[in-house]
C-alpha cells in the first residue's frame, strides 16, 4: 500500500504551518545521521536536523510546533484509520552537491503505517523499496529494488506500510528538504 495525496491540508492552514516551520523561529536539533536508529551509521553527508512533535505514543510535546501540527496529525490518523500516533517529527536535510541517498531503514520494527508530509517543494525523492523489514538490521543495499520514488512537493502526503524499507535523498538543487515524518497504528 502506497498512497500519495496532493493538497492534503487546506491551503490557509498549510501556509500557517509552512510559514512557521520554514522560518527562523523553528527550532532544529542536529542529528549525525538523519535515519538514525538501528540501521543508521554515521558518515559524511548523512547529517540532518529534526524536531520531535510526538516522541511517545499520543503524547504531544509541549511546544508551539506540536500545537500547530495537532490538527494535521489527527486528520492523518483519522484518514488512514489508525488509533494511535506513535511518533512524529519534523526532519530537514540540507543541500549536498550531487545529492546523496540516506540509509534505507524502517522507522520502527513494530507494525505501523508511515507518513511523510512535505513542507516545501524540493528535490531529493523519497524511495520505497520492494523489500520489507524481516527482523534483521543488516541490509545489503545492492539487493534492494525500487518500488516507487516520490518527489517532495509542498502539501503532499505520502502514506505507506511502515515495514517497507525506505529512504530519502538530500537535495542537490535546493537549500533544504523539510518534511513531517509520522508513524501510526
Where are these regions (language model features)?
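Catalytic core of non-heme Fe(II) oxygenases with the double-stranded beta-helix
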Residues: 56-185
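Non-heme Fe(II)/2-oxoglutarate
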Residues: 1-83
Amino acid at each position: 500500500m502506497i498512497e500519495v495525496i496532493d493538497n492534503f491540508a487546506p491551503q490557509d492552514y498549510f501556509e500557517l504551518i509552512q510559514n512557521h516551520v520554514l522560518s527562523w523561529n523553528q527550532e532544529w536539533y542536529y542529528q549525525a545521521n538523519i535515519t538514525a536508529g538501528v540501521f543508521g551509521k554515521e558518515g559524511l553527508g548523512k547529517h540532518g536536523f529534526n524536531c520531535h512533535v510526538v516522541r511517545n505514543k499520543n503524547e504531544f510535546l509541549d511546544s508551539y510546533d506540536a500545537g500547530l501540527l495537532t490538527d494535521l496529525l489527527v486528520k492523518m490518523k483519522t484518514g488512514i484509520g489508525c488509533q494511535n500516533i506513535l511518533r512524529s517529527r519534523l526532519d530537514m536535510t540540507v543541500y549536498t552537491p550531487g545529492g546523496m541517498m540516506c540509509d534505507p531503514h524502517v522507522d520502527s520494527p513494530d507494525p505501523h503505517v508511515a507518513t511523510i508530509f512535505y513542507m516545501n517543494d524540493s528535490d531529493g525523492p523519497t524511495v520505497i523499496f520492494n523489500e520489507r523489514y524481516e527482523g534483521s538490521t543488516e541490509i545489503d543495499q545492492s539487493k534492494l529494488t525500487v518500488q516507487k520514488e516520490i518527489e517532495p512537493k509542498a502539501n503532499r502526503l505520502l502514506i505507506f506500510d511502515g515495514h517497507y524499507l525506505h529512504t530519502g535523498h538530500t537535495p542537490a538543487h535546493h537549500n533544504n528538504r523539510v518534511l513531517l515524518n509520522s508513524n501510526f497504528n
